Swiss-Prot record:
One of the record's GO molecular function terms: UDP-N-acetylmuramate-L-alanine ligase activity
Binding residues annotated for ATP, in chain numbering: 123-129
GO cellular component, one term: cytoplasm
InterPro entries according to UniProt: Mur-like_cat_sf, Mur_ligase_C, Mur_ligase_C_dom_sf, Mur_ligase_cen, Mur_ligase_N, MurCDEF_pg_biosynth, UDP-N-AcMur_Ala_ligase_MurC
Name of the featured protein: UDP-N-acetylmuramate--L-alanine ligase
Classification via Pfam families: Mur_ligase (PF01225), Mur_ligase_C (PF02875), Mur_ligase_M (PF08245)
Pathway: Cell wall biogenesis; peptidoglycan biosynthesis
Reported function: Cell wall formation.
EC assignment: 6.3.2.8
Family in the record: Belongs to the MurCDEF family.
Amino acid sequence: MVESQKAMPQPKMGRIHRIHFVGIGGVGMCGIAEVLLNLGYEVSGSDLKVSPVTQRLESFGAEIFVGHRAENAAHADVLVVSSAINPANPEVATALERRIPVVPRAEMLAELMRYRHGVAVAGTHGKTTTTSLLASVFAAGGLDPTFVIGGRLTAAGTNAQLGTSRYLIAEADESDASFLHLQPMVAVVTNIDADHMATYEGDFNKLKKTFVEFLHNLPFYGLAVMCLDDPVVREILPQVKRPTVTYGFCEEADIRAINVSQKGMQTHFTVLRRDREPLEVSVNMPGNHNVLNALATIAIATDEGISDEAIVQGLSGFQGVGRRFQVYGELPVEGGSVMLVDDYGHHPTEVAAVIKAVRGGWPSRRLVIVYQPHRYSRTRDLYDDFVQVLGDANVLLLMEVYPAGEEPIPGADSRQLCHSIRQRGKLDPIYIERGAELAPLVKPLLRAGDILLCQGAGDVGGLAPQLMKSPLFAGAKQEKSK
């Protein structure tokens, strides 16, 4: 049965009163900071610039510093850092000199989870959407979960929230193997793909073993929820010595989807569960990859005793996550308009899934992609895959690689990608010079009825709102909030 609402014992971290976040504006950091603020801790943080995220935290009482300086950390009882922070950072150096503990963000998340019934969502792709769906369904089921998500949940207007129930739903980050800090009661593995391989010394077997180790952080009475459609997840399944539930499209899955149909943004399917009546479900998200995300959610909600009615309501009422196939609106062009979509996908598997979703939901429309590769190392490691999947667009514009702190790698840049895609003979990509304005470049290429997709994890994320405001697209119609 679903638990009733009750006051949740809050974590007490002994002598810790003031918590300082180095890089507080980061998507993985700000959510934890917001939860800690709501728990009554003093929170400070530094970042390189003011942003809506830092302004939001400041409005909740956080002290925000612009720039990294030693004095920012002077009064902290603990520093929280992400893997993106250089160990030579002056705030980190000061903390170490003064014997102030410096902990990774995942360790702080683990501390919050230690006092709760933790649900941790891991996997190379789909973490943010699955975590968000879980938050929506748990809320619909009468629970009030705490959640920490790697994207802005549209309905809540934030990526984190302190709830009153015993549940904490959070993403588990494999990029730096920090998810090994977490000790959840329930863990999801959506898929395992080659990404962040520097963390695993280029050894895919090491990556797989780390996922198994993560699942063994579950207690013997916990639950591992695993996608049977993913070949690598299927491969590691026999090694997992914890209770498991599988999901997918395949017949062997404990929870599976059949009769999938998609029209535009809406996807409908039937869910089969062992010893349960079939469940008819609709989600306002395109693509089979989102069906899988919904199945993981249904598996956990069913196990936690949430009613079928609440599951259906939570999924159908889900309003999406920022930059996960986010429809911004319609851009006017000669003879009609173009649907403008923003998406965070930055791995070939994610790009392919979105292209497939567009082809399934809007089969008669052209797809124009503005893509920005993220990191030179990822571009190098997955070069052939990028060439193949990006070549499936109808029109392709490539921005220069977003370095994310990396130095350029010869042959792993967007000019070379353009050349390789052009050699395939399917289309002629357009290279966008760094700093060039997009609107004058893209407008002549658009036709009425097109879908314009701005995709990637770098500063490409700012293009969609810029296009909506561009004088060249005067009269653009903003997508209405659901």
